[in-house]
Regions:
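Acidic, glycine-rich flexible loop segments
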Residues: 88-139
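Bacterial N-terminal signal peptides
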Residues: 2-9
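Residue-level signal for mature regions of secreted extracellular proteins and peptides
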Residues: 3, 27-28, 41-42, 106, ...
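An ectodomain-focused feature that recognizes extracytoplasmic/extracellular
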Residues: 18-89
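Sec/Tat signal peptide C-region and signal peptidase I cleavage site
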Residues: 13-17
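A short, surface-exposed beta-strand/turn
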Residues: 78-84, 137-150
Length: 150
């Protein structure tokens, strides 16, 4: 399981499953390269594939889904910033091991993501923040410039 693999140990910050956002309104997949994915001292960059999913929900939530090997997904999620149109205020990380028998682990977080327009060529998604007071997270991905698939 990805949560075990990451050794996050943040059970105090787990958000109840019923708080997950419904009403997906858009999902894009872009290709490119993970620049960095890490939690605390665990560098997961080498486990990234060359795909990133970008999901938008009816309530304004956005999720950046960093696709990892073995069907694992590392998601950074939050609400669009009111001050900056290309920014998301991160409030959770979702760890999904890709198995239908296991529920994703949702961990409270604080941070932000910035991103560009994937339809205008190369762009970079950059996310950073904290899980609780002690553990930093970083996730960044650069697209190859090809248009996203829907």
């Amino acid at each position: 399981m990805l949560a075990t693999m990451l050794a996050v140990g943040c059970s105090a910050w787990v958000i109840r499953a019923e708080e997950t956002p419904p009403n997906l309104v858009g999902l894009l997949t872009v290709r490119g390269q993970c620049l960095k994915v890490s939690i605390a001292r665990d560098d997961l960059t080498g486990r990234c594939t060359g795909e990133l999913g970008m999901a938008v929900y009816a309530d304004g939530r956005t999720g950046f889904h960093f696709m990892m090997r073995s069907r694992h997904i590392f998601t950074v999620s939050g609400i669009h910033s009111k001050q900056q149109s290309n920014a998301v205020q991160v409030d959770r990380i979702v760890l999904n091991d890709g198995l239908e028998t296991n529920k994703p682990e949702v961990i409270a977080a604080e941070g932000s993501c910035t991103y560009g327009d994937p339809y205008r060529g190369r762009m970079t998604v950059r996310c950073a923040g904290k899980l609780g007071r002690l553990q930093d997270f970083v996730a960044s991905f650069e697209t190859d410039g090809t248009p996203p698939t829907e």
